[in-house]
């Protein structure tokens, strides 16, 4: 089992380094419309990472000092990813659309968050689910950025994404190490696997319109190279205890509705806390 040096990570954590980025060169290179649409989706999600912490912060996850330290750095870094993507879009002459963070949570969502908190505190190993969920989403995000850089063919964007990806890989390493460590108990692994099988959907799919999620999946993960990226996620997660044979990203893409929106069902919160989301587009 690999180790993760949380102290080294905390010491290195900082806002995304954008020194040397040639912002003046951004408009000199063509940026495909598909890349603009994808960037807006990603920028919105990165900028609202703080929202995803609401439920998580009420669980046992933050009782672990390593997890608490990581999350403080994680949300700071992710927020700066969103700012960097917004700055790039503006430099390219494109607007970003602000989605204000809600100060008041709807009653139904608040009740679901409370239920999650109660369940998580009653079952100490629930943190394993959070960590597994985070590993899946961070690796998917990393590979999504890699695909976007390849497809967009914009040299300045490629440099910005490369810097973001270094952060995302560190995030993935932490989540994966923690999941691997916590899933060694067969009962924990079995329950975590059942929850992932039943509820997983990519980050943002509960917040973004279905057509945007569908577009993102098609643009980034179709074709031989896209499918290979999707398989990399599944193959890595299958190495976790209890997750042999799990079908995640490819199964999600194959099961996504092409024409009509999916009915509103139970989904899983992007950070790993169970919640009723707007639409379950997985399967």
Where on the chain are the PLM-derived regions?
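Non-heme di-metal
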Residues: 1-283
């Amino acid at each position: 089992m690999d180790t993760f040096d949380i102290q080294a990570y905390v010491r290195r954590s900082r806002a995304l380094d954008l020194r040397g980025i040639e912002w003046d060169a951004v408009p000199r290179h063509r940026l495909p419309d598909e890349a603009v649409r994808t960037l807006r989706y990603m920028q919105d999600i990165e900028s609202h990472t703080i929202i995803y912490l609401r439920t998580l912060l009420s669980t046992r996850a933050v009782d672990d000092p390593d997890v608490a330290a990581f999350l403080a750095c994680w949300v700071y870094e992710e927020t700066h990813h969103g700012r960097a993507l917004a700055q790039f879009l503006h430099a390219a002459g494109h607007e970003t659309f602000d989605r204000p963070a809600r100060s008041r949570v709807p009653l139904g969502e608040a009740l679901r968050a409370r239920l999650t908190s109660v369940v998580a505190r009653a079952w100490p190993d629930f943190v394993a689910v959070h960590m597994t969920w985070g590993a899946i989403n961070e690796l998917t995000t990393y590979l999504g950025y890699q695909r976007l850089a390849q497809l967009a063919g914009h040299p300045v964007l490629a440099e910005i994404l490369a810097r973001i990806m270094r952060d995302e890989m560190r995030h993935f390493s932490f989540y994966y190490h923690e999941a691997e460590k916590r899933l060694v108990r067969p009962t924990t692994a079995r329950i975590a696997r059942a929850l992932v099988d039943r509820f997983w959907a990519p980050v943002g799919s509960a917040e973004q319109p279905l057509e945007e999620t569908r577009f993102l999946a098609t643009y980034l993960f179709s074709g031989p190279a896209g499918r290979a990226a999707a398989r990399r996620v599944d193959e890595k997660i299958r190495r976790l205890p209890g997750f042999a044979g799990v079908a995640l990203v490819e199964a999600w893409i194959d099961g996504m509705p092409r024409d009509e929106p999916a009915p509103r069902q139970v989904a899983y919160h992007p950070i790993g806390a169970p919640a009723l989301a707007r639409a379950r587009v997985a399967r």
